[in-house]
Amino acid sequence: MNNLVKLTISQAISGLKNKEFTATDLVTAHINQMDKYRCINAYITEIPELALQAAKKSDFLIQTNQARPIEGIPVSIKDLFCTKGILTTAASKMLQNFTPVYDATVYSKIINAGGIMLGKGNMDEFAMGSANINSYFGNVINPWKAENDDIDLTPGGSSGGSSAAVAAFMAMAALGSDTGGSVRQPASYTGTVGIKPSYGRCSRWGMIAFSCSLDQAGIITRTVEDAAIMLETMMGYDEKDSTSLNVEVPNLRSAVNQPIKGMKIGIPYDLMENKSLSSEIITMWQNTINLLKDHGVEIVSISLPYINYALPVYYVLSSAEASSNLARYDGVRYGLRVEGKNSNINEIYELSRSEGFGAEVKRRIMMGTYALASTNINSYYIKAQQVRRLIVNDFTNSFNKVDCILIPSAPTAAFPLNSNQDDPVTMYLNDILTIPASLAGLPCISIPAGFSANKLPLGMQVIGSRLDEYNIIKISSAIEKALNLKFIPKGF
């Protein structure tokens, strides 16, 4: 029964339909896997009893021919999404005892489609981080190890628990969030598939806010087809979210295994000169370009001059929005309450926020508050918004010539957990390749496309024009099929 955890979602759906095994069997196998690899720390909260109850319901619906689209599929839910009656912490001491009274819309969509939650995935606190070292509940460990080395590696962030759970076969899919790359970069580090849809495709209702103009739900799976299946269940208009788009949900699964001959793929060749990119990443990029050429794709050189400013623009805007969003956690309205000797209101604010937030969250709040100060707002926040528009224009101009854009997902393979912890700028550079598409609100997917010299997975990123999730699935599926590589951590 342990082999059940190795199935893809499409295989599991078929097996359940054909009565080869039950949803209870499938969930039990994943619970056993979670028990075996708890040292990875992929989950903050586990709910095996509730998962088994849900599995019994799924078995009944399957037996009575009432199965929903993803009936019986075990999933991990990032601990940023509200789950009624189940602890939701955002990996912060500030919310360590918070139990929501309602469900996030995107979580409801997954459950209503038949998905079964196994638990709440670990993450960087309030989704701020690129290495999953900022969780109040401890680091997540990447299931992958470098060849001939036993050093613990980062699973990426902020959805590190999500990516680790999928890579270690502790969930078939994991709901994550992507603000500046928090689904795609972890997917790259763990040999999984991570997709972020266009901004507004998935509801943000019930997703604890970090940066409202950038936050978007995403999904991590082990294949492109599985990502398409899951994303279809998540997308759709939600009147409770003012940024939700009232547009038709495409049939993404139909994009899998479609011919790509004649499509045009844009390559920003100038980016290959960026010193942050390792030689292994550039080699993988060039190999993927050659593979696409062999399949009849036209490669077009494009220019994205303003993406060199994407990183500072992102950290000004996201920190400013975080400063505003996190102001509510003061120990009086929301969050951990710490009272001092005097118990006056200012002391409660100061002590609660000092003790409730971790170092990285405090750093970004301070950066954001500085950028929004009346003496600084024109120089920082307003200027960043103006440059963001130039970045959007770069992409718009490029998509007048091409169907998709191909760039790597991360500048390197996964790095040791204990490296660069005291160097926030170096940490921020890990998102240099994912942030541009986030600023433009574009759909993008990271797929595993090669290995480093140390046998660690490397990811490629396909970026589409606004609302064109179909073509990024189409291209990434073709790359996945042509490469035909297996991405399974040693020992799993």
From Swiss-Prot:
Top-level taxon of the source organism: Bacteria
Oligomeric form and interacting partners: Heterotrimer of A, B and C subunits.
Protein name (Swiss-Prot/TrEMBL): Glutamyl-tRNA(Gln) amidotransferase subunit A
Protein family according to the UniProt entry: Belongs to the amidase family. GatA subfamily.
InterPro entries: Amidase, Amidase_CS, Amidase_dom, AS_sf, GatA
Gene3D superfamilies to which the protein is assigned, alphabetical: Amidase signature (AS) domain
A GO term for molecular function: glutaminyl-tRNA synthase (glutamine-hydrolyzing) activity
Swiss-Prot/TrEMBL catalytic activity: L-glutamyl-tRNA(Gln) + L-glutamine + ATP + H2O = L-glutaminyl-tRNA(Gln) + L-glutamate + ADP + phosphate + H(+)
Keywords: ATP-binding, Ligase, Nucleotide-binding, Protein biosynthesis
Functional summary from the UniProt entry: Allows the formation of correctly charged Gln-tRNA(Gln) through the transamidation of misacylated Glu-tRNA(Gln) in organisms which lack glutaminyl-tRNA synthetase. The reaction takes place in the presence of glutamine and ATP through an activated gamma-phospho-Glu-tRNA(Gln).
Broad enzyme group: ligase
Residues forming the catalytic site: 78, 158, 182
Pfam families: Amidase
GO cellular component terms, A-Z: glutamyl-tRNA(Gln) amidotransferase complex
PROSITE patterns recorded: AMIDASES (PS00571)
UniProt-listed Enzyme Commission number(s): 6.3.5.7
GO terms for biological process, alphabetical: translation
